[in-house]
């Protein structure tokens, strides 16, 4: 092996410093660690992890709040290391191009009266979004509750409220869209309040104060004391990326990021889908309606799980883009 003097010469530093590195009285800089790894043929990741660990212990090792601070830092590092996928895959880019061709057709089509069509699509959206969450109302029953004010025998009060609330939440996001209001914390909490109104009055429009688990998923949402900070980061991320990303990618990212934080006791899925659709509507697209049948639901959950646990959003972005493309195609062929 190399002698201390030789290592010092090769690194271009004083020999006494090497001795201090060895004894632990001095810490090498990042650049010195990288040079050492190369010189001593040590795996860079191994030595960097060891160096960072020592750095953390030196700074906070003896502090009584160290563990809690580390938990907060871990969540934040995870969040910040999930960059928006700015370099899009060829497959995704191809679908986005096809969507934009359809959107151009839609823009000329909109000159005709499309109120009746929009109404039909919104009804289907309420039906499907609630069906994903286990609501057993049929499309016809959903229509009767919304448009005729009927009560369906054999269906629970909660199921009726889910239909009415979702319908009102759509009206609210359309109002935001018409006023050109950006999504922010106040508007998000209002949307959530509408979704859970009369169902969980004490939780409607409030972040959760307890830990939650997502049934059937290995993703563990952040601890309740981290939720407020994660949501601050969520809106900062939106403001930072809203002008640089394709609107479909932006909408899908905001959907995935919100459902991953899971900031509410209940209603996370419906609220995340409404946020996504608000962004789509604001950019002149139409509601992306994820179906609630078993196969569609499982596909949706699978792509979300991959984004959450493997930090790979490609499948989820493709899934949302495909849904929007199908929604546009359907809208354009309705007579």
Regions found by a protein language model. Give the residues of each.
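DNA major-groove recognition helix of helix-turn-helix/homeodomain DNA-binding modules
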Residues: 29-46
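Short, conserved catalytic or interaction motifs in soluble domains
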Residues: 23
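Generic structural marker for isolated residues within well-ordered, non-membrane alpha-helices
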Residues: 4, 33, 276
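Short alpha-helical DNA-recognition segment
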Residues: 2-20
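FIC/Doc superfamily catalytic core
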Residues: 54-63, 74-335
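Short amphipathic recognition helices of helix-turn-helix/homeodomain-type DNA-binding modules
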Residues: 43-67
């Amino acid at each position: 092996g190399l002698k201390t003097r030789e290592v010092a010469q090769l690194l271009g530093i004083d020999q006494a410093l090497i001795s201090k590195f060895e004894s632990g009285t001095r810490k090498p800089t990042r650049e010195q660690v990288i040079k050492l790894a190369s010189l001593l043929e040590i795996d860079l990741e191994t030595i960097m992890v060891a160096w960072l660990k020592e750095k953390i212990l030196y700074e906070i090792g003896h502090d009584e709040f160290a563990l809690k601070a580390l938990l907060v830092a871990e969540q934040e590092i995870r969040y910040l290391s999930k960059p928006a996928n700015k370099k899009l895959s060829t497959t995704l880019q191809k679908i986005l191009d096809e969507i934009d061709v359809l959107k151009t057709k839609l823009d000329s089509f909109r000159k005709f009266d499309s109120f009746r069509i929009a109404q039909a699509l919104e009804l289907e959206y309420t039906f499907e979004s609630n069906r994903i969450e286990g609501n057993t109302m049929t499309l016809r029953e959903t229509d009767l509750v919304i448009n005729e004010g009927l009560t369906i025998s054999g269906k629970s009060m909660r199921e009726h409220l889910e239909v009415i609330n979702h319908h009102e939440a759509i009206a609210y996001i359309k109002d935001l869209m018409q006023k050109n209001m950006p999504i922010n914390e106040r508007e998000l909490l209002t949307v959530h309040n509408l979704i859970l109104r009369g169902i969980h009055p004490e939780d409607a429009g409030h972040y959760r104060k307890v830990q939650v688990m997502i049934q059937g998923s290995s993703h563990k949402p952040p601890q309740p004391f981290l939720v407020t900070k994660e949501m601050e980061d969520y809106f900062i991320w939106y403001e930072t990326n809203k002008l640089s990303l394709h609107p479909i990618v932006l909408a899908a990212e905001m959907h995935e990021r919100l459902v991953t934080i899971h900031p509410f006791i209940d209603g996370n899925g419906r609220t995340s889908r409404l946020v996504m659709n608000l962004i789509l509507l604001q950019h002149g697209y139409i509601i992306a309606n994820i179906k609630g049948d078993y196969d569609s639901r499982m596909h949706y959950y699978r792509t979300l799980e991959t984004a959450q646990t493997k930090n790979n959003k490609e499948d989820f972005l493709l899934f949302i883009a495909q849904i929007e493309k199908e929604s546009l195609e359907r809208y354009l062929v309705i007579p």
